[in-house]
Amino acid sequence: MEKTFLMVKPDGVQRAFIGEIVARFEKKGFQLVGAKLMQVTPEIAGQHYAEHTEKPFFGELVDFITSGPVFAMVWQGEGVVDTARNMMGKTRPHEAAPGTIRGDFGVTVAKNIIHGSDSLESAEREIGIFFKEEELVDYSKLMNEWIY
């Protein structure tokens, strides 16, 4: 089953959106297989944002993601990577459609509530940065037979 990595960023945690976001993905029919509230270290932030190390905004990314706790999650389901991206909305909240997480709650590009993997490859890499294999729980949900 396809997996993706999602993270409620420090602004989303401080604004009490964890429950709302989890509920949206559960109601969609996706399965939460790993989750933790954590403080991102500069080392983890550097790994997570490795593709941006040479960009002028890299320092701001690291400063923000380490500024407070995040809620890291692994979700699984059919088409979860692409569907999660659609549910999050465009990166710039003012361009995100109403009904999406960023469209409903995002304020600025920097403080846009949530991060989600943009591909299966990114999901695998990001899951490996934030979770150990034994932290992910593989279980059957009775409702899956009604969804898939």
Curated annotation (Swiss-Prot):
EC number(s) stated in the UniProt entry for this protein: 2.7.4.6
Record Pfam families: NDK (PF00334)
Any GO BP annotation: CTP biosynthetic process
Compartment(s) of residence: Cytoplasm
Disulphide bond pairs: none
Residues involved in ATP binding: 9, 57, 85, 91, 102, 112
Top EC class, one word: transferase
Keyword Magnesium appears in the UniProt entry: yes
Entry cofactors: Mg(2+)
PROSITE patterns tied to this protein: NDPK, NDPK_LIKE
InterPro entries in the record: NDK-like_dom, NDK-like_dom_sf, Nucleoside_diP_kinase, Nucleoside_diP_kinase_AS
An annotated Gene Ontology molecular function: nucleoside diphosphate kinase activity
GO CC entries: cytoplasm
Keyword Kinase: yes
Residues modified to Phosphoserine: 122
Reaction(s) catalysed by this chain's protein: a 2'-deoxyribonucleoside 5'-diphosphate + ATP = a 2'-deoxyribonucleoside 5'-triphosphate + ADP; a ribonucleoside 5'-diphosphate + ATP = a ribonucleoside 5'-triphosphate + ADP
Chief localization: cytoplasm
List of residues that carry Phosphothreonine: 91
Residues of the signal peptide: none
Keyword terms, alphabetized: ATP-binding, Cytoplasm, Kinase, Magnesium, Metal-binding, Nucleotide metabolism, Nucleotide-binding, Phosphoprotein, Transferase
Active-site residues, record numbering mapped to chain: 115
Assembly and binders: Homotetramer.
Chain's role: Major role in the synthesis of nucleoside triphosphates other than ATP. The ATP gamma phosphate is transferred to the NDP beta phosphate via a ping-pong mechanism, using a phosphorylated active-site intermediate.
UniProt similarity note: Belongs to the NDK family.
Protein name: Nucleoside diphosphate kinase
UniProt source species: Bacillus anthracis
